[in-house]
Amino acid sequence: MINEIYENSNSRMKKSIDFFKKNISKIRTNRVSPSLIENIYINCYGTSVPLSKLSNILSEKSNILKINVFDNNIIKKIEQAILSSDLGVNPQIQENYIRIEFPKLTEARRFELIKLINKEAEQNIISIRNIRRDANEKIKKLIKAKTIGKDEDKKFQEVIQNLTNSRIEDTKKILKLKEKEIKKI
């Protein structure tokens, strides 16, 4: 029973960190990444489809993305979806592909991005702590039901605290790497 609680907590904390990584990977640094636009949805073929399923997205230069569209009939729809996104860029249609040139980051924008990723990191840390709290509450219920003793409770709390500290440290490492990436000129 205790092992199940531990494994569940560990799994949830890993998912939380993966979600955090995914969220901050979408935040632009000096080098643009296809992940910035791959989840823009385009209304075509009677449904809403992510751009990554309709095209091949390449990083042409540090600030230019090239979108090789599979079906030229939807190239205008893709352009409209990019224009209506909050990226603030102008896509340029050229033959069978779209080029997007992103402006260089200003110092003020870098500062805003660092604040944003710090906020994301703090939310992730709160999520990890909530998972720890849930695990501790489950253990307290087991104590009340007299399924486990107080000694096991203390050991488990120590183990879950070490896991929590480790996952928070992982979050902080990911944060520092992303900050370094944003600050890099």
Swiss-Prot record:
GO terms for cellular component: cytosol. Keywords: Cytoplasm, Protein biosynthesis. Pfam families: RRF. SUPFAM superfamilies: Ribosome recycling factor, RRF. GO terms for molecular function: ribosomal large subunit binding. One of its GO terms (biological process) is cytoplasmic translational termination. Belongs to the RRF family. Responsible for the release of ribosomes from messenger RNA at the termination of protein biosynthesis. May increase the efficiency of translation by recycling ribosomes from one round of translation to another. This is Ribosome-recycling factor. It comes from Wigglesworthia glossinidia brevipalpis.
